[in-house]
Amino acid sequence: MAPKAEKKPAEKKPAAGEEKSAEKAPAGKKPKAEKRLPASKASSKEGGAGDKKGRKKAKKSVETYKIYIFKVLKQVHPDIGISSKAMSIMNSFINDIFEKLAQEAARLARYNKKPTITSREIQTSVRLVLPGELAKHAVSEGTKAVTKFTSN
């Protein structure tokens, strides 16, 4: 029974704490306002927490081609789906191809002693990296996309 008696005063203490917090609430508003001005460091820490949220957004902005792979899949085969593992493999494949094309375009620009990679370097790198018929189709689609982009 002694523990019950100890619990009752403990229960009374939070009630007293609630009364104190109720008493401090009006007075607490003024110190909070006062604290906000010098506590800009605290708000910057809160901004730091906002940065973490910003970091989460940055993680979301990681470049993936999953949406575009899915759109192309639905254009070609509307009734077929794709697993997440297969989507990840396709995304890695596209990243690898783009990296090879970029490296080859940079090499071509360096050979020609030009500081800028233009559509001509990209087109030549596509012809060098991709085989045969695939290169021809890629070049035609690329030129079509560039003309559409420049016309707008």
UniProtKB/Swiss-Prot annotation:
Protein modification: Can be acetylated to form H2BK6ac and H2BK33ac. Monoubiquitinated by BRE1 to form H2BK143ub1 and deubiquitinated by UBP26. Required for heterochromatic histone H3 di- and trimethylation at H3K4me. May give a specific tag for epigenetic transcriptional activation.
Cell location: Nucleus; Chromosome
Secretion signal span: none
Primary localization class, coarse: nucleus
Pfam families reported in the protein's UniProt record: Histone
Modification sites for N6-acetyllysine: K7, K35
SUPFAM superfamilies, per the entry: Histone-fold
Lineage, opening ranks: Eukaryota, Viridiplantae, Streptophyta, Embryophyta, Tracheophyta
GO MF annotation, one: protein heterodimerization activity
Protein name, UniProt field: Histone H2B.1
Cross-link (Glycyl lysine isopeptide (Lys-Gly) (interchain with G-Cter in ubiquitin)), chain numbering: K148
GO cellular component terms listed in the entry, alphabetical order: nucleosome; nucleus
Coiled-coil portions: none
